[in-house]
């Protein structure tokens, strides 16, 4: 059978006592994949490869994928490849008369790929390693096919492996404009892009599945970095496909698959890997098995990773109490190439962790138990009285089907479905206080976030006179459901509190259902590509009435209305990129979009006796207009032969209107002059607006011996008023990160099969606060912080004499400098951490 693999997909996982539950359905997926492959391969007929000696080709420069399709069509040969192999890659084109082998070589020059002949045609594989050591660097741009890809930052598998991150947030923290917020504790991280850090402001997508978790003083991302092969970051509201919300941007993550692990001449393999981090004495144990059929009809992967660490050490030598990391993750993945035009991808992933920890993962120290409690309960039990035992499970399942006949450029149809679920169960010991935890989910709580998404889209390529079109049309359905329940034993005999079992009034349950349609056309004329597009969203929020009558009062004066609210609206976008010269590309985007309130914002309540008791069903949508302009400089053979330098500069401005925010402080305009506010007042309201603007510079340099990168980001943001007073003075936005620069400088030593280098992180002080414009707004402020610089080292060794062996070492905070990241809210940074790993492929 011959194949042209247009689309591939996603993942699987598990852990500990529940590992069997995770592996079971995933194994059934892989068994199905193998059986289906056998059926289709038995039905297929081999087609002899036809290769002309020499022929004329005229393939323009641009995206690598259509260029390869054009070459294969012209030569009348079958070419097998996956979208992951060519994503974000371009070609200089091909003009003239060539033999087929030379044509492939020229078209693939610089891509790291080569065309390998098979019995039925050709298969795209990783190019054979060169004599010199090649160290991929942080990608400045994902591609230059349109303005969105030109503004996208990308981390590839080499970047991820070099950092050896404990979590996704610390991995992305080195990209300009992207910051980690929260604490180093497991599960204590969230992400901030361009000064926007709420869950609804940063979309996270893992193998096509929306991810998100919002719980008081908890992190929002729990993904194991060891399982990732690629991370794309779209900054700002400029990608129409990213859905309602995501004003800060979208982070799209892809997990590894068999094609990433296998060498060109292999159809089966495995991996064993061990890593150790000295700071928390953490061991990381990983293993994988992967393979593909002889002719590439199917591939599959099973990957396991287990973290087992102790308490994290601060620079001063003390440790974060109860910060140990105990997480296990499984990934399983299979691609079926049903025909030469169809691909089916099945994937599943599961991660689990449990252990004693503070309720608020985003915190530094914990107040130690009193000596009286230690004497009464013993040291360990006294500590556990102020902790929770947290059991967390995170699962992802997805399936994707793609139909893309080469002879029909108008048809490239993709249908995908994804299911994501994150659960947390917290329980305090029976001897913990019965009266202290109403505001922190009681003595036991159950929280579940479930996302389901179905997407259908088609991409058509055609020409109209001198114009080339890439027309994308799609529809999407997304349902987000959150369930919450807590047990508060102090009210176990009270009917108004439903005898202790009820939803936290500050964390309501409910559903958000979004139906969307989007249309986008990338129109190219020579070196200019203009991309107009529009998206329509229909969003319905429905609250779940609280079980406790205290927070579900039938009296209209309480304002406890959990009924549905619907929002609709359009989101237009216009982007352009102009390849002015072979070394300079200019790009720009203008977008106007909106977001509906999330469940918390719409349905949070307080008791009827409060001054703001009601739900917030009268909220307007929050709107944003984003403008981005930038330039990409790309040079080759600049200092030495075959070196390269790439620089991207970006200026942006986001103007928000009707910001959805808590109603606190000055509750209404009449209250400013001593008047009375109408009742009932809602918990949330719309503030006038805000402006966030900034500049970014990203660059990298690579040569035979030296490589390096530099990234710089400066952002400022102001509200039109105070967060506590919509009629007050302008105030700084608290979540704006300080000016930051990241640098990497490395040296390759080919004769040793090694590379080593230095990293530097330079952070300015952050001395802007909402309290500067309104002293009473200090409750919304973050503590001001001093500037600091951190230095690190890294090295890698891949001996050619030991096939498949690799050793890495990285040192973070080399000089053990004491520092407090601004978005960490006074939480200390991590002390010196020496991280090393050894792996063997077989």
Predicted regions and their residues:
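Transmembrane beta-strands of outer-membrane beta-barrel pores
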Residues: 255, 274-280, 295, 306-310, ...
């Amino acid at each position: 059978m011959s194949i042209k693999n247009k689309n591939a997909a996603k993942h699987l996982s598990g852990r500990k006592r529940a590992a069997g539950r995770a592996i079971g359905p995933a194994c059934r997926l892989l068994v199905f994949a193998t059986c289906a492959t056998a059926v289709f391969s038995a039905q297929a007929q081999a087609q002899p490869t036809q290769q002309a000696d020499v022929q004329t080709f005229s393939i323009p420069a641009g995206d690598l994928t259509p260029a390869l399709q054009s070459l294969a069509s012209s030569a009348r040969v079958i070419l097998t490849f996956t979208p992951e192999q060519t994503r974000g890659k371009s070609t200089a084109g091909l003009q003239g008369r060539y033999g087929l082998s030379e044509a492939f070589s020229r078209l693939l020059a610089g891509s790291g790929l080569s065309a390998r002949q098979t019995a039925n045609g050709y298969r795209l594989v990783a190019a054979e390693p060169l004599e010199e050591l090649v160290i991929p660097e942080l990608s400045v741009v994902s591609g230059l096919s349109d303005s969105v890809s030109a503004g996208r930052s990308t981390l590839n598998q080499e970047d991820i492996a070099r950092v050896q991150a404990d979590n996704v947030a610390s991995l992305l923290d080195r990209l300009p404009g992207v910051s980690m917020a929260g604490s180093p504790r497991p599960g204590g991280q969230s992400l901030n892009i361009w000064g926007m850090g709420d869950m609804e402001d940063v979309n996270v997508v893992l193998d096509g599945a929306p991810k998100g978790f919002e719980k008081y003083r908890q992190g929002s991302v729990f993904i194991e970095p060891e399982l990732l092969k690629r991370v794309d970051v779209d900054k700002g509201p400029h990608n129409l496909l990213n859905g309602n919300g995501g004003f800060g941007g979208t982070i799209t993550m892809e997990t590894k698959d068999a094609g990433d692990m296998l060498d060109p001449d292999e159809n089966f393999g495995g991996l064993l890997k061990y890593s150790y981090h000295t700071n928390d004495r953490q061991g990381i144990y990983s293993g994988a098995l992967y393979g593909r059929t002889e002719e590439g009809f199917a591939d599959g992967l099973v990957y396991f990773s287990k973290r087992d660490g102790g308490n994290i050490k601060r620079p001063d030598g003390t440790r974060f109490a109860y910060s140990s990391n105990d997480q296990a993750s499984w990934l399983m993945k299979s691609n079926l190439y049903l025909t030469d035009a169809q691909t089916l991808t099945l994937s599943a992933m599961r991660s689990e962790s449990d252990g004693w920890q503070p309720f608020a993962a985003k915190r530094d120290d914990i107040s130690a138990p009193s000596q009286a409690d230690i004497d009464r309960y013993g040291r360990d039990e006294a500590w556990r009285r102020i902790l929770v035992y947290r059991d967390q499970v995170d699962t992802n399942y997805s399936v994707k089907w793609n139909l893309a006949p080469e002879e029909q450029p108008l048809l490239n149809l993709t249908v995908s479905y994804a299911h994501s679920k994150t659960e947390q169960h917290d329980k305090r010991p029976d001897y913990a206080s019965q009266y202290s935890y109403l505001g922190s989910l009681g003595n036991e709580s159950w929280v579940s976030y479930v996302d389901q998404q179905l997407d259908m889209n088609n991409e058509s390529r055609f020409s109209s006179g001198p114009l080339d079109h890439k027309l994308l049309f799609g529809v999407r359905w997304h349902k987000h459901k959150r369930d919450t329940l807590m047990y508060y034993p102090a009210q176990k005999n009270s009917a108004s509190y439903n005898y202790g079992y009820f939803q936290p009034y500050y964390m309501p349950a409910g559903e958000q259902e979004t139906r969307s349609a989007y249309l986008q056309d990338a129109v190219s004329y020579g070196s200019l590509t203009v991309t107009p597009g529009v998206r329509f969203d229909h969003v319905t929020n429905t609250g779940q009435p609280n079980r406790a009558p205290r927070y579900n009062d039938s009296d209209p004066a309480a304002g406890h209305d959990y009924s549905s609210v619907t929002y609709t609206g359009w989101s237009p976008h216009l982007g352009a990129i102009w390849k002015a010269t072979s070394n300079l590309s200019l790009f720009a985007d203008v977008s106007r979009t909106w977001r509906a309130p999330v469940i918390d914002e719409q349905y949070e309540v307080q008791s009827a006796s409060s001054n703001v008791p009601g739900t917030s069903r009268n909220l307007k949508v929050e709107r944003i207009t984003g403008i981005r302009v930038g330039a990409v400089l790309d040079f080759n053979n600049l200092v030495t032969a075959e070196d390269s330098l790439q620089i991207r500069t970006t200026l942006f401005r986001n103007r928000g209107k009707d910001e959805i925010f808590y109603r606190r402080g000055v509750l209404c305009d009449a209250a400013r002059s001593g008047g009375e506010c109408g009742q009932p007042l809602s918990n949330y309201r719309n503030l006038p607006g805000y402006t966030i603007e900034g500049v970014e510079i990203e660059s990298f340099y690579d040569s035979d011996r030296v490589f390096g990168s530099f990234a710089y980001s400066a952002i400022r943001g102001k509200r039109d008023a105070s967060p506590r007073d919509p009629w007050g003075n302008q105030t700084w936005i608290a979540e704006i990160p300080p000016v930051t620069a990241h640098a990497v400088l490395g040296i390759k030593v080919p004769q040793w099969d090694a590379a080593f280098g230095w990293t530097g992180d330079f952070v300015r002080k952050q001395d802007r606060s909402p309290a500067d414009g309104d002293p009473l707004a200090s409750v919304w402020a973050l503590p001001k912080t001093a500037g600091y610089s951190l230095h690190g080292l890294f090295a890698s060794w891949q001996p050619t004499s030991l096939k498949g062996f690799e050793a890495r070492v990285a040192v973070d905070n080399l000089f053990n400098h004491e520092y407090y990241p601004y978005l960490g809210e006074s939480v200390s940074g991590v002390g010196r951490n020496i991280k090393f790993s050894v792996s063997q492929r077989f």
